[in-house]
Swiss-Prot record:
The EC number(s) this enzyme carries: 2.3.1.275
UniProt gene name: plsY
Entry-linked InterPro entries: G3P_acylTferase_PlsY (IPR003811)
Key words, A-Z: Cell inner membrane, Cell membrane, Lipid biosynthesis, Lipid metabolism, Membrane, Phospholipid biosynthesis, Phospholipid metabolism, Transferase, Transmembrane, Transmembrane helix
Name of the protein in its database record: Glycerol-3-phosphate acyltransferase
Subunit architecture: Probably interacts with PlsX.
Associated pathway: Lipid metabolism; phospholipid metabolism
One biological process term in Gene Ontology: phospholipid biosynthetic process
Length: 192
């Protein structure tokens, strides 16, 4: 059952809502505009705030639902919950449907954390909003949110495995944002 849940997590994470919705509703491929990323930030740039918000919500849900299922089926198996959540985020970053060229995993990670460490997800979301409101730089908000999730998870997670997952997700976020980090250091990162 564990393998099936992990596979389900990966396949759910692989659903490229940003690509599908911009193509179906706007007739454009989000990968050819803005940053070329498939996530909510670039969808907002390419197709508008409303569609960006829908993609944000759907990307979070595709992280949350497989984890909810794993928690319901195997309530005393935090390692399985972590594996399923990690698989969902990796599915978003490396989707089988897009030749492993996906997004940065921020919204999907938020969905995973909403289930496993809701306090960390809430704190991260609040920090993102605050940092973005001041800086108008989405990547800076995402990185600050990821760091906040790690700290909050260390203090509030019900299982040490969940705190470890938060740290691992932040490490993945650093990897997927490596170009953004360089641009932040050079002060050339895009603002909204």
């Amino acid at each position: 059952m564990t393998s099936a849940l992990v596979l389900l997590g990966y396949l759910a994470g692989s659903i490229p809502f940003g690509v599908l919705l911009t193509r179906w509703l706007r007739g454009v491929d989000v990968r050819t505009g803005g940053s070329g990323n498939i996530g909510a930030t670039n969808v907002t740039r390419v197709a508008g705030k409303k569609l960006g918000a829908v993609v944000l919500l759907l990307d979070a849900i595709k992280g949350a639902l497989p984890v909810v299922l794993a928690v319901r089926l195997l309530p005393d198996a935090p390692t399985v919950h972590v594996a399923v959540g990690l698989a969902a985020v990796l599915g978003h970053i490396y989707p089988v449907w897009l030749k492993l060229q996906g997004g940065k995993g921020v919204a999907t990670a938020l969905g995973v954390l909403l289930v496993l460490v809701p306090q960390a997800a809430l704190a991260a979301a609040l920090v993102y909003v605050a940092v973005f409101a001041v800086s108008r730089v989405s990547s800076l908000g995402s990185l600050a949110a990821g760091a906040t999730a790690v700290g909050t998870s260390a203090l509030t997670a019900r299982a040490v495995e969940y705190a470890g997952l938060s740290a691992l997700l932040f490490a993945l976020m650093l990897w997927t944002h490596r170009g953004n980090i360089l641009r932040l250091a050079r002060r050339t990162e895009r603002r909204f």
